[in-house]
Structures are given as C-alpha cells and as structure tokens.
C-alpha cells in the first residue's frame, strides 16, 4: 500500500502545472486553474481605499463576474518594492483541498532523487558579505543606524529544468506546518516557498496577524534545543526588537480598527531549523476595510524593511 501511494504521488506531483497557483495553510488550502486576467498595477497606494490600486482591483472583479466567474478571487504576489508591478491575477477557477492529506502525501517527495546542481553562486560572495556584516556592525555602534538587515542570494543552475511542482512537494515535506505557496509569474517563472509567518488573515470584519522577529537555531539534542528556546524568550535584545515590530504594526492598524488586541509577551514557535518569537495580533477592521487594504498597510513587514 505504501508503494502504491508513493507511485501515485510521483504521478500527481506533475499535475500542478507551472501556471497554477497553490496555497496551503491551517485555515484554507486551494489551487487554481487558468487565468482570466492579470493585475500588474503597483500596490504603492494599496492601503488607500480611494486609491488607484483599489479602484482598478474592484474593476477587475467586476469584469470577472460579468464574464461568468461566480466567486472570483485574486491571487499572486506583491513585490517588496511596491512601486514595482504587482504579480497578481484572477484565475478562471479554483478548488480547495485537504491540508492533512497533502502533508501526508508530500512525505514521499523527500525520497525522490535530488536534482543535479552544476553551478552554485552566492551573491555577494562570502568574503564580500562578511565585509558587509563587519561594516554594518560598526555602523550600529554609531547614532546613524540602530539596526541593519542584510541578505544575499544563492543562484543555482541545474542540469535539467526544475520541476516547480516537485520542488514544492519537497518544501512541504520539510516544512509541513508552514504556509506553503507556488505563485506563477508573468515572465514564466515561479515564486515558491514555505513561511511560518502570517502577514494577514481576514474573515468578515475580524483579522489576524502573526509577525515574527527574533530567532535562534534549533539544536539536535532535545535538552539543548529547549534551552535555546528558553534563552531566546528570555533575551532582552530579541524581546526589544520583537516589541519594536509589534508596536509598529499596532500603530498602523489601530486607526483602521474598531478592536485591536496584542498579548503582553511574545510566544515561541518553531520550524524544523529555527525558534522564533511570535505575537498573535487580532482585531476587528472598520466596515470599509478589505483584506488587500490591510495587507498593503502592513507590507513590507518591519523586520524586512530594515526596522528595527
């Protein structure tokens, strides 16, 4: 029976076309088919209910309903730089699926043959990146900078074309409790990943957010692992940085909410590799707010935008 299920998974992993959107969460999981229309308008004013982004989005939904799509949805991604074009679209159809079943079937993807990597390039390279870290650390000792967020890219070339559906299965197998996503892009590429962080979920007037700030590496030994989590929770530095994030989010959400609540202290959540400090934010939005206006209000999150 296990063998037949593994064979079934091998067949089904190819059934997610590169042009399909996939989203899996504890609250709703679904895939899409087809593309009725693409929406590339920049989201720079997306939080403004009277702005161009919101008006164009409403017009796109009106056109979809007029074309016979009974319950149109808009899916995709908004770039870090919201002045750049959005990567959103209205699919012709969508359907939900069982998250537990997908978590179970994705376990078999971890046993599939890995792809042959023929080139791996770090951008910037290690020496350059470490020099950037040294310079950033020195700057934080001056009044000019409080904190710096650094990142780098890894450019990988494989011998064969990457099967994004198979790669998604591996991500789910490694991160079954995360928010897993597969976003087709207008240039033919795919954005996919697994994140433990929730920017925004809205149901009716109620909304929820789970920002993360402050992390520690997991340890292979259970005792040391628990100790790493306790140290993170007790860390004055990490608690301070986490509070800067949550208070910044509270400041922008409060004027748009009729109710807003945050716990006094963060909680610990885990991924397979890291401990994180997290705070469950919840509230009730004002009557005219929609999910996109609140999401644009919060995007990019403070930790990503360099604050704190």
For each of these PLM feature ranges, what is it?
Residues 49-157, 162, 258:
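Non-catalytic accessory segments adjacent to catalytic cores
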Residues 18, 145-147, 176-180:
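Short secondary-structure junction motifs
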Residues 143, 200, 247:
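Conserved hydrophobic/aromatic pocket- or pore-lining residues that grip, position, or stack substrates
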Residues 70, 191-193, 307-308:
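A short catalytic or substrate-binding loop motif that flags glycine-/basic-rich loops and adjacent residues
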Residues 23-39, 157-240, 260:
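An anion-binding catalytic pocket shared by soluble metabolic enzymes
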Residues 32-33, 41, 96-127, 133-134, ...:
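Contiguous alpha-helical scaffold segments within structured protein domains
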Residues 25, 147-151, 182-185, 265, ...:
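Short coil/turn segments at secondary-structure boundaries
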Residues 1-53, 156-161, 165:
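Short Lys/Arg-enriched alpha/beta "domain-start" segment
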């Amino acid at each position: 029976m296990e063998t037949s299920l593994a064979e079934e998974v091998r067949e089904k992993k190819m059934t997610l076309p590169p042009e399909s959107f996939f989203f899996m969460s504890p609250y709703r999981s679904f895939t899409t088919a087809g593309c009725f229309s693409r929406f590339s308008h920049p989201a720079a004013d997306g939080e403004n209910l009277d702005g161009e982004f919101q008006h164009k989005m409403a017009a796109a939904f009106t056109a979809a309903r007029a074309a016979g799509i009974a319950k149109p949805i808009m899916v995709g991604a908004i770039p870090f730089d919201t002045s750049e074009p959005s990567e959103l679209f209205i699919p012709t159809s969508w359907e939900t699926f069982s998250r537990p079943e997908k978590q179970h079937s994705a376990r078999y993807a971890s046993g599939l043959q890995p792809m042959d990597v023929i080139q791996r390039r770090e951008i910037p390279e290690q020496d350059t990146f470490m020099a950037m870290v040294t310079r950033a650390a020195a700057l934080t000792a001056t009044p000019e900078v409080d904190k710096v967020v650094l990142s780098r890219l890894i450019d990988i070339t494989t011998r064969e074309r990457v099967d994004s559906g198979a790669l998604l299965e591996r991500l789910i197998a490694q991160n079954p409790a995360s928010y897993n996503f597969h976003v087709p892009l207008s240039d033919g590429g795919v954005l996919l990943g697994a994140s433990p962080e929730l920017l925004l979920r809205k149901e009716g007037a109620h909304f929820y957010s789970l920002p993360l700030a402050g992390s520690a590496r997991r340890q292979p030994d259970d005792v040391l692992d628990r100790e790493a989590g306790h140290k993170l929770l007790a860390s004055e530095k990490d608690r301070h940085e986490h509070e800067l994030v949550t208070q910044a989010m509270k400041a922008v959400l409060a004027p748009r909410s009729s109710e807003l609540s945050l716990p006094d202290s963060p909680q610990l959540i885990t991924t397979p590799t890291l401990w994180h400090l997290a705070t469950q934010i919840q509230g009730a939005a004002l009557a005219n707010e929609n999910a996109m206006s609140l999401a644009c209000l919060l995007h990019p999150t403070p930790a990503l935008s360099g604050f704190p």
